[in-house]
Amino acid sequence: MSSWSFIFSVVVSAQGLVMNGYLVGLLVVAAVVALFLMYVIGLYNNLVALKNRFQNAFSQIDVQLKRRYDLIPNLVETAKGYMSHEKETLEAVIQARNTAMAAGQRAASNPGDPSAISNLSTAEVALAGSLNRFIGLAEAYPDLKANQNMLALQEELSSTENKIAFARQAFNDAVMHYNTACETFPGNLVAGFGNFQKGALWELNDTAQREPVQVKF
């Protein structure tokens, strides 16, 4: 073999090694990028799942709230025949119920909206106050207390109040889990890029808000 042939073969071999190294480098970079994208997609999908979870948790609250909103007119209608002198109180209960129901509908359409959840909380406090005043007055009417329909409604309302409390706690837990994922690294980067907004807790800020409706005649 001539010296020129040898040099040519060395050059070709070197070029082959360089090309192979370049391809290997490209493959490594492509693999790293693919893994990174898969990781980001996983974080994004996790945020979507957590958001869906807390929205579904609110739907459970909504079911129980609607059940209570349906019960209240029946309670008032049953009491009318016995509490004819308490018209103002009965009307206040219905008005508070209607206000809370409207606030509940707005919150159900967007459970992550802080103002909607805050308005619902305020309306529910007012409704609880009206119901407690109504129930307190009803205790002065023995015939009403003994009414079988009223007793059945009382039992159903009490059960519903308990379910609302449990559903609210489950909702708040789901929101906190979602918010933590949105606020901690690296989820906060994906949350910002994907425009994930923090969820709003249904907070009970004072003693009055924490007092459940006392359904007892």
Model-inferred region functions:
Residues 4-217:
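A helix-centric hydrophobic-segment signal that preferentially recognizes long
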